[in-house]
Swiss-Prot record:
The keyword Cytoplasm applies. GO terms for biological process: formaldehyde catabolic process; one-carbon metabolic process. This is Bifunctional protein MdtA. The keyword Glycosyltransferase does not apply.
Length: 288
C-alpha cells in the first residue's frame, strides 16, 4: 500500500504548524508543505501530485490548501482544481485560517441545538466580515435562515455579504454595527447570534443578549478573554443561561478539530474528493 502523502499549499510564507499536526492526526503518513503558494506557481506542484501514481494508488496522494488569507486560498484552490483533468486528479481540501472547519462546526452545533432546522429564523453574525464570519453567514443562509452580516463599516459589510451571495447563491444582507448600541440594536428580533471578531474585543455584553427575548442560541468563535459574548465561557457547548443556550470557542473547537481530522482521512478514500465549505459542512452535520 502506498504511503499517504499530503501536500500542503500555504499562501503564507511558512506553512501552518497547526495544519501539519492535524494532518498527521488525520492519517497522513508524510506531509510536505510549501509556502508563498500562488495561482501562478501552484501548477507545477499539482503536476507532481497527479502524474506520479496511477490507479488506486492515486488516492494516497492529496492536497490541502491553507494560509491566513481565505481570499488568497480560494484563488489557489481554484487554480488547483483547474489543473485537474480526466483521471489526472487527486482529492483536495480548502481550509485557509481554519475558516471552513471552524464555521462548519459552529453552524452545525447551533443547527442541531435548534432542533435540526433554522429555516425562516433570523441569524445575526457580528464582526462577520472575516472568513469565519462570512462562511458562517453562508452556511446559515444555506439552511434557510434570514442572515444579517454585520461589520463596523457598512461598505465592508456589504462587500462581504455580496461576496457570500455570489459564491454561495444565497441572500445575506449587511448592516453597520460600529458600537455596542448598534450591535445591541442589530440583535433585536434575532433567534441566533454569532460573533466572529478579533481577539480581545467583547462585541455583545451579557445584558444585550440575555434581555432579548427572541434570542435562542449564541455562539462565539473567540477563545481568548475577553470573549466576544459577555457572560459565557469559552468551554460552553450548549450550556443554558436563563433559557438560552451558548456555545463558546472551545466548545466549538472540539468538533472543529475532529472535523478537520475526519476531512483529512476522507481525502485518502478516493482521488476525486473536493472539500470546500459545503462538503465540510455536510460532514460536520453528521458529526455534531
Amino acid at each position: 500500500m502506498s504511503k499517504k502523502l499530503l501536500f500542503q499549499f500555504d499562501t503564507d510564507a511558512t506553512p501552518s504548524v497547526f495544519d501539519v499536526v492535524v494532518g498527521y492526526d488525520g492519517g497522513a503518513d508524510h506531509i510536505t508543505g510549501y509556502g508563498n503558494v500562488t495561482p501562478d506557481n501552484v501548477g507545477a506542484y499539482v503536476d507532481g501530485t497527479i502524474y506520479t501514481r496511477g490507479g488506486k494508488e492515486k488516492q494516497s496522494t492529496a492536497i490541502f490548501v491553507g494560509g491566513g488569507d481565505m481570499a488568497a486560498g480560494e484563488r489557489v484552490f481554484e487554480a488547483v482544481k483547474k489543473r485537474f483533468f480526466g483521471p489526472f486528479r487527486v482529492s483536495c481540501m480548502l481550509d485557509s485560517n481554519g475558516s471552513n472547519t471552524t464555521a462548519a462546526a459552529g453552524v452545525a452545533l447551533v443547527v442541531k441545538a435548534a432542533g435540526g432546522s433554522v429555516k425562516g429564523k433570523k441569524a445575526v453574525v457580528l464582526a462577520g466580515t472575516g472568513p469565519v464570519g462570512m462562511r458562517s453567514a453562508a452556511l446559515l443562509a444555506g439552511e434557510g435562515a434570514e442572515v444579517v452580516l454585520c461589520g463596523r463599516k457598512l461598505d465592508k459589510a456589504q462587500a462581504a455579504a455580496d461576496s457570500v451571495n455570489k459564491r454561495f447563491k444565497v441572500n445575506v444582507t449587511a448592516a453597520e454595527t460600529a458600537d455596542d448600541a448598534s450591535r445591541a440594536e442589530a440583535v433585536k428580533g434575532a433567534h441566533f447570534v454569532f460573533t466572529a471578531g478579533a481577539i480581545g474585543l467583547e462585541l455583545l455584553p451579557q445584558a444585550a443578549w440575555q434581555n432579548e427575548s427572541s434570542i435562542e442560541i449564541v455562539a462565539d468563535y473567540n477563545a481568548q478573554p475577553p470573549l466576544g459574548i459577555g457572560g459565557i465561557d469559552a468551554t460552553d457547548k450548549g450550556k443554558e443561561y436563563g433559557g438560552k443556550r451558548a456555545f463558546g470557542a472551545l466548545g466549538i473547537g472540539g468538533l472543529k478539530l475532529k472535523l478537520h481530522r475526519a476531512c483529512i482521512a476522507k481525502l485518502f478514500e478516493s482521488s476525486e474528493g473536493v472539500f470546500d465549505a459545503e462538503e465540510i459542512y455536510k460532514l460536520a452535520k453528521e458529526m455534531a
